[in-house]
């Protein structure tokens, strides 16, 4: 502030010095009075602007302080709400940058220096965009109303977090940038609704209506686009783009009516009756059947288990054929599905073990990769949104302890195991339908690891998830829901060594909560195979058993 005042006074003195000998002329002196009056007005405006800046900063600081007190009490529970996660990305990437610009000219050099330095470690534009798209993905997968998300009323939430007009507008704008006019319409409409309800915002109705009219037009609804454009012009009659759009939409409407009349006349002349159905364009391609089934199963719909098949599923105490480790204290085993055969082990991992694995993995997390069948290399993919870390028994004896537990329960040896992969799924994180084994068209899928194919999959669940997070099998209509302290297990290969395509599965996005997982590729040469899987391995048979441990927990 002092620097700005010095610059202002310097400019003023230079201006005054251009007119010297004022005392020799009352006329000149009277001019000075008016000059001084203008100076005072300018000075007061400067003070008003600075006070306004400080008031904005103070108000923003108070809001953040209140938010931080709530968030720090349970950081992971707080960020388990996807809106909170999105707003955190938005605050750190956009709003803190706006604050930096606001106070940059002030004398708070220490704050600016610290903020500038810290911003190097802040989320990027890509992070903000990614969080926004995650919200849109959750909205589609779980059929959530826009207002439900905007008001924070998600199922099972502890911390409700309403979205502002700016938040909704930002989602709509990101969708618009992707030519996703369906979601653009949804979120611009929500922004407009909140503005109509009297919410104060830096975003005006004209800007929102401009996006909204174009999004509706792109979906083929000329009449609605025309109505929105007329409303925009009622607020700003000089809006050039809207005036041009109005003429264009009216022309298109006339052309459309003319085409419809010609088509109707042609049908009458040909003596046929046409039945026309209008279908709203959503701005994206119709999902493939697997995608539909995947999303239905994630919502708990479309599960294809009949009562007769259900009656053949049982629970039992299991010791893996009198394994010494479980002879006196067998584990609880439950049949989850028959084809493919999936079993669940109850009370198989403790809370302290979960926390230990998380603490080991957190500093090592990097963006997860998948095998590209075209290049044969590992690469990132949009269908797998997570970060991964790698752990071994050298990092902590617990890793070996968990591996030994799996070996004792499955009878499969893991002496030549690769490192264990730990994955963390972020907001809306998912792993879309995939196979855990290599197909015939991927003979070199695991060549770089020096392994055979993946025989089986093991999953640990670490919390009871309030909403989302299921493991689903679209081809057979199966869904397995997370339950704290349990693990599920299935084989990916038939006895012949051929892949079981019914094991194609997916990790549904977690709607509320955080999801952690760890996987491990292991050579397998010999060992006992359960009776329900009559698959004999010889000393020379080389397969890879794939253990994936899904840790669903709140990161602290």
Predicted regions and their residues:
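Fe(II)/2-oxoglutarate oxygenase catalytic core
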Residues: 2-487, 493-556
């Amino acid at each position: 502030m002092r620097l700005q005042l010095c610059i202002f006074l310097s400019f003023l003195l230079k201006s005054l010095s251009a007119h010297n000998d004022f005392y020799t002329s009352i006329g000149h002196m009277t001019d000075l009075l008016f000059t001084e009056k203008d100076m005072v007005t300018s000075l007061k405006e400067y003070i008003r602007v600075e006070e306004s800046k400080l008031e904005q900063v103070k108000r923003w600081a108070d809001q953040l302080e209140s938010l931080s007190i709530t968030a720090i009490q349970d950081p992971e529970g707080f960020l388990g709400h996807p809106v909170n996660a999105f707003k955190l990305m938005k605050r750190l990437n956009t709003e803190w940058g706006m604050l930096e610009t606001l106070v940059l000219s002030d004398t708070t050099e220490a704050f600016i220096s610290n903020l500038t330095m810290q911003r190097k470690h802040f989320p990027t534009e890509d992070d903000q965009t990614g969080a926004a798209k995650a919200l849109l993905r959750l909205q589609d997968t779980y059929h959530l109303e826009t207002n439900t998300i905007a008001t924070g009323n998600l199922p099972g939430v502890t911390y409700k977090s309403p979205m502002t007009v700016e938040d909704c507008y930002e989602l709509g704008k990101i969708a618009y940038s992707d030519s996703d006019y369906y979601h653009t319409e949804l979120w611009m409409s929500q922004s407009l609704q909140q503005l109509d309800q009297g919410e104060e915002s830096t975003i005006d109705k004209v800007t929102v209506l401009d996006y909204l009219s174009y999004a509706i037009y792109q979906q083929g609804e000329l009449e609605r686009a025309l109505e929105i454009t007329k409303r925009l012009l009622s607020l700003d009659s000089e809006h050039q783009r809207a005036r041009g759009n109005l003429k264009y939409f009216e022309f298109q409407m006339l052309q459309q009516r003319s085409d419809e009349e010609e088509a109707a006349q042609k049908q009458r002349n040909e003596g046929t009756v046409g039945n026309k159905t209008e279908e709203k364009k959503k701005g994206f391609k119709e999902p493939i059947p697997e995608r539909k089934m995947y999303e239905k199963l994630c919502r708990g719909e479309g599960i294809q288990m009949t009562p007769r098949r259900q009656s053949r599923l049982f629970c039992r105490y299991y010791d893996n054929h009198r394994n010494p480790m479980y002879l006196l204290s067998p584990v609880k085993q439950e049949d989850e599905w028959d084809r493919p055969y999936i079993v669940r082990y109850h009370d198989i991992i403790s809370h302290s073990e979960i926390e230990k694995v998380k603490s080991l993995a957190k500093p090592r997390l990097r963006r997860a990769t998948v095998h590209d069948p075209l290049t044969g290399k590992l690469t990132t993919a949009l269908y797998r949104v997570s970060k991964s870390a790698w752990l071994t028994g050298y990092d902590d004896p617990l890793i070996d302890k968990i591996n030994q537990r799996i070996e004792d329960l499955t009878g499969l040896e893991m002496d030549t195991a690769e490192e264990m992969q730990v994955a963390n799924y972020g907001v809306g994180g998912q792993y879309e339908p995939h196979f855990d084994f290599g197909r015939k068209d991927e003979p070199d899928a695991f060549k770089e690891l020096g392994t055979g194919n993946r025989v089986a999959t093991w999953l640990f669940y670490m919390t009871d998830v309030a909403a989302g997070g299921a493991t689903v099998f679209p081809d057979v209509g199966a869904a397995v829901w997370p339950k704290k302290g349990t693990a599920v297990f299935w084989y990916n290969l038939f006895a012949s060594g051929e892949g079981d395509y019914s094991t194609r599965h997916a990790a549904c996005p977690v709607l509320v909560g955080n999801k952690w997982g760890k996987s491990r590729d292991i050579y397998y040469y010999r060992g006992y195979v359960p009776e329900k899987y009559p698959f004999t391995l010889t000393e020379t048979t080389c397969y890879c058993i794939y253990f994936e441990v899904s840790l669903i927990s709140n990161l602290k």
